[in-house]
């Protein structure tokens, strides 16, 4: 009888040992809980412009229910150097929770940046460019898609608007200078070339001045330009912080009456300068929408949503068919709205842009749009 009892006990222990643990136990749940997969957005530098884009990323995360899919989107701000982007891309290759990467490329021809983008792609990670692209002529296989502004068109719009401002002041010839962070950046170069093309042959571009994303240097560049070219007729700001830098130095020198100022993007300070009469017009992108569409695209690539990809890129495979553009706005002073004699009208610009992709807004109307989305700049 004793031997029988021992045998039964041993069998009981053996059976217990062979049972599978409860998969719903707290310990098991804790060990297997999934860390959210991340979509990473790498900026080219640190500027409030990217805060607006990040607001769009988070709005996109909510709109497309990333959390329900075990995903999140995170913005990482680069230190305004190519090496910073290279190093971060290399780090992301080694991280298991990266599902997709969007990058605003700081140098369009930087081979190392493109090579690191390709390494991510080879690992199965979706990679796109947003806001700043690579040079597609040199690196046709560097990325599948771009989201952002058609910067050549944007430059032509600014050049056309600037020429109208100059002509309204009786200035039909003279020199202009363009200011940006980097002259070899894809979006900056396309804008400057487009502006030079559209402003016309009567106006000569005498310099392009880069500040390497240094806001203090941006102001110093304007001061230097005014010393070197005292008769300059127009100053053109290409990146968001260039606009307030130009406006501040022109006000400091007391020469607003003889210098026209037209710029890109609507930094909060630039909006105030326009309200005070220190900027003539601004071409404004839609970084908020860039953020929303970035999430939409990365999710579609992650989940193989072919219908979304076709909707976003109906002409994929054709020249320019890999680009999703997010529209442009021309912001004008309130005094020009409904004024038949205003220097600029939408009709003046229609030849430079496709139908339906340009809005002309007064500053007050634009401010209302910003307020609607809780933004201070765009």
At which residue positions do the language-model features occur?
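Short, solvent-exposed amphipathic alpha-helices that sit
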Residues: 49-65, 154-158, 186-203, 221, ...
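Hydrophobic alpha-helical
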Residues: 99-122, 195, 207, 211-273, ...
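Hinge/cleft segment of the Venus flytrap/periplasmic-binding protein
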Residues: 19, 25-35, 175, 179-183, ...
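Hydrophobic alpha-helical segments within soluble ligand-binding/sensing domains
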Residues: 85, 146-174, 218-219, 266-270, ...
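Short beta-strand elements in bilobed, periplasmic/extracellular small-molecule ligand-binding domains
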Residues: 63-79, 173-178, 195-215
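Extracytoplasmic "Venus flytrap"
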Residues: 33-60, 64, 72-89, 104-111, ...
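Flexible loop/hinge segments that line or gate small-molecule binding clefts
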Residues: 116-153, 267-273, 279-280
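C-terminal motif of bacterial Sec signal peptides marking the signal peptidase cleavage site
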Residues: 14-17
């Amino acid at each position: 009888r004793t031997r029988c009892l021992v045998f039964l006990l041993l069998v009981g222990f053996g059976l217990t040992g062979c049972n599978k643990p409860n998969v719903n136990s707290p310990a098991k749940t804790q060990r297997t809980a999934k860390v959210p997969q991340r979509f990473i957005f790498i900026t080219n530098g640190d500027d409030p412009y990217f805060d607006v884009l990040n607001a769009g990323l988070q709005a996109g995360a909510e709109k497309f229910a990333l959390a329900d899919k075990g995903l999140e989107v995170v913005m990482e701000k680069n230190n305004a150097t190519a090496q910073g982007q290279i190093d971060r891309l290399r780090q992301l290759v080694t991280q298991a929770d990266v599902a997709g990467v969007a990058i605003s490329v700081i140098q369009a021809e930087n081979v190392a940046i493109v090579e690191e983008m390709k390494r991510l792609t080879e690992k199965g990670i979706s990679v796109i460019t947003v806001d700043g692209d690579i040079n597609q002529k040199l690196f046709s296989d560097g990325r599948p898609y771009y989201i952002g502004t058609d910067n050549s068109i944007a430059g032509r719009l600014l050049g056309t608007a600037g020429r109208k401002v100059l002509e309204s002041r009786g200035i039909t010839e003279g020199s202009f200078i363009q200011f940006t962070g980097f002259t070899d950046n894809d979006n900056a170069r396309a804008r400057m070339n487009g502006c030079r093309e559209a402003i016309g042959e009567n106006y000569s571009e005498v310099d392009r001045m880069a500040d390497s994303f240094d806001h203090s240097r941006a102001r110093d560049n304007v001061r230097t330009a005014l010393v070197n070219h005292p008769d300059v007729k127009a100053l053109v700001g290409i990146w968001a912080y260039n606009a307030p830098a130009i406006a501040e130095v022109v006000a400091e020198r007391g020469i607003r009456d003889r210098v026209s100022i037209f710029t890109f993007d609507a930094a909060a300070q630039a909006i105030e300068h326009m309200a005070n009469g220190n900027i003539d017009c601004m071409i404004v992108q839609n970084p908020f929408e860039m953020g929303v569409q970035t999430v939409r695209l990365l999710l579609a690539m992650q989940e193989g949503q072919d219908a979304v990809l076709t909707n976003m890129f109906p002409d994929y495979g054709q020249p320019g068919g890999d680009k999703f553009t997010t529209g442009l706005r021309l912001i004008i002073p309130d005094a020009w709205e409904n004024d038949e004699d205003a220097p600029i009208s939408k009709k003046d610009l229609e030849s430079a842009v496709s139908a339906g992709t340009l809005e002309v807004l007064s500053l007050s109307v634009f401010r209302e749009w910003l307020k609607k989305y809780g933004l201070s700049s765009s």
